[in-house]
């Protein structure tokens, strides 16, 4: 039944999403700050507090050591659980729409989606957002089919979880409120005003409860934090902006979307258009939500592949529903053989979806086993003179902690100067004067300064030009000693280059 479906999809997804999630916390630029909030009892409200609160509770219940690595790994487990919850919710949604077999197929298709698998490995809020969106879609279908107080409260709670996952999750209100207003409940006492009050109370209670600063002793202004985040989304990030709308996310989908997923999701859209009169509003919402979300993020100059996660996660669901529509053409309720043929068609098309999803999933899984920063540190230890001085982009990770100067706990015996961006340590000439002999740069850091579609934002032009000029000179005048190319998992394979900028020492004369 559906409970077995939900439990099996959740457990299977959770086991998959927690594989190889023990890499160093310093590899992800955001995880150190988040674990610091948990350990120090600080909350900055850059994002809603659901993920951090669950991480804090899980670490205390599990008697986890209050160290950065232990807390981050606990938080990654929480993120994996939320992602697994999203897969289970979408499996139940497919069951409600197209039957139990479709539910199993959708659960497998969503769980094996490579972007969801990767993002579930980080202490980041994106899985919490996807969980809330998936639960909201399920709740919308349940409310429409059985309008009552329980399903209405569930819809309010689910929408609250979407908003408390990430602030952008509040977009669920765009479809949830009209569904509450337009759809009459079976209970005559549930008038429009009563429905709105019940929904609003459930939503507000969930949002406020999820943002309670549990175990926190120091808070920053939530209004200032939210304002800063919104400015970054609307205006750009780290002094860099671009023209909007842009096609970055469409290009990502075109490049990464498995063909079976795209074709069968398109088939579902065509099926809805061809039978529009007998379709329910929640069915249309299931299609329009990812399309609307894609349009929204394409109007923000702040770009990251993880922002596409809600779209990437919902597309396998739509593809499975498309497969179910095709199977429905074959199947006839009064014929056992036709029903069996329809089930075979659905299973076969779902197998096609899974088969096209497996190559990127295998690549992502293998990516979490390749640790380039550790290889770089080992190579430097073995091949550079002990008196070398290395300036690095922090993403190279010779220094686990951001030092903004000389690193105290370098992973190599050589002296390391560390900053978020190596140019912030000084110009090439200034670094040479300080005795710097080598520069280690990271594509994940410098590539933004060589993208024709990006540019400096207002007062950030001076810093933008300084960083670009620094990298250009290193690439032009430095001697490339070794390169570790960028890989699938950019936090473990960020694309590292090691240059010598000081003249090579002449060999000592023979005695």
Name every feature range the model reports, one short phrase each.
Residues 2-27, 108-112, 201-217, 295, ...:
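Transmembrane signal-anchor helices characteristic of membrane glycosylation enzymes that use polyprenol
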Residues 15-16, 322, 342-370, 408:
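Transmembrane alpha-helical segments
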Residues 34, 41-47, 53, 60, ...:
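Transmembrane-lumen/periplasm boundary regions of multi-pass, lipid-linked membrane glycan transferases
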Residues 65, 73, 77-97, 135, ...:
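Transmembrane-helix motifs of polytopic, lipid-linked glycan transferases
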Residues 96-97, 136-154, 162, 184-186, ...:
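Membrane-interface transmembrane helices that cradle and orient dolichyl/undecaprenyl
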Residues 115, 121-128, 304:
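Short acidic/glycine- and proline-prone juxtamembrane loop motifs at membrane-interface regions
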Residues 381-416, 432, 436-447, 491:
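Short periplasmic/luminal acceptor-recognition loop of GT-C membrane glycosyltransferases, typified by
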Residues 426-429, 434-511:
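Aromatic/acidic, Gly/Pro-rich catalytic loop(s) in extracytoplasmic/lumenal soluble domains
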């Amino acid at each position: 039944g559906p409970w077995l479906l939900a439990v099996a999809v959740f457990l299977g997804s959770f086991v998959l999403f927690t594989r190889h999630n023990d890499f160093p916390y310093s590899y992800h630029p955001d995880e150190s700050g988040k674990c610091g909030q948990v350990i120090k009892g600080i909350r900055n409200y850059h994002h809603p507090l659901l993920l951090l609160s669950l991480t804090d509770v899980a670490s205390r219940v599990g008697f986890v050591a209050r160290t950065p690595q232990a807390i981050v790994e606990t938080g990654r487990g929480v993120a994996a659980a939320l992602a697994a919850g999203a897969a289970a919710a979408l499996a139940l949604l497919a069951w409600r729409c197209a039957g139990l077999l479709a539910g199993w197929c959708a659960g497998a298709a969503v769980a094996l989606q490579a972007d969801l698998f990767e993002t579930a490995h980080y202490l980041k809020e994106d899985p919490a957002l996807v969980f809330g969106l998936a639960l909201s879609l399920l709740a919308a279908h349940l409310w429409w089919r059985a309008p009552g107080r329980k399903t209405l409260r569930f819809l309010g709670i689910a929408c609250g979880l979407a908003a408390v996952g990430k602030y952008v999750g509040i977009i669920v209100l765009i479809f949830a409120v009209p569904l509450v207003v337009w759809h009459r409940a079976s209970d005559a006492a549930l008038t429009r005003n009563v429905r709105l009050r019940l929904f609003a109370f459930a939503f507000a209670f969930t949002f406020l409860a999820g943002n309670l600063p549990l175990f926190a002793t120091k808070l920053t202004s939530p209004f200032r934090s939210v304002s800063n985040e919104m400015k970054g989304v609307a205006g750009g990030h780290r002094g860099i902006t671009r023209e909007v709308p842009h096609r970055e996310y469409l290009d990502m989908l075109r490049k990464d979307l498995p063909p079976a997923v795209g074709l069968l999701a398109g088939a579902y859209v065509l099926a809805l258009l061809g039978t529009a009169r007998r379709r329910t509003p929640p069915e249309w919402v299931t299609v329009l939500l990812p399309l609307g979300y894609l349009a929204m993020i394409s109007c923000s100059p702040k770009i990251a592949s993880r922002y596409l996660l809600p779209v990437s996660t919902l597309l396998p669901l739509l593809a499975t529903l498309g497969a179910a529509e095709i199977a429905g053409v074959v199947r006839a309720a009064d014929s056992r053989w036709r029903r069996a043929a329809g089930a075979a068609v659905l299973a076969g098309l779902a197998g096609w979806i899974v088969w096209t999803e497996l190559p990127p999933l295998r690549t992502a899984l293998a990516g979490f086993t390749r640790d380039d920063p550790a290889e770089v540190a080992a190579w430097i230890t073995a091949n550079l003179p002990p008196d070398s001085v290395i300036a690095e982009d922090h993403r190279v990770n010779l220094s686990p902690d951001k030092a903004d100067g000389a690193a105290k706990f370098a992973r190599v015996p050589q002296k390391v100067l560390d900053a978020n961006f190596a140019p912030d340590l000084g110009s090439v000439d200034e670094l040479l004067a300080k005795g710097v002999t080598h520069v280690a740069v990271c594509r994940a850091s410098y590539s933004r300064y060589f993208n024709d579609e990006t540019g400096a934002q207002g007062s950030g032009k001076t810093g933008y030009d300084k960083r670009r000029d620094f990298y250009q000179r290193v690439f032009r005048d430095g001697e490339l000693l070794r390169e570790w190319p960028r890989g699938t998992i950019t936090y473990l394979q960020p694309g590292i280059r090691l240059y010598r900028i000081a003249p090579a020492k002449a060999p000592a004369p023979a005695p």
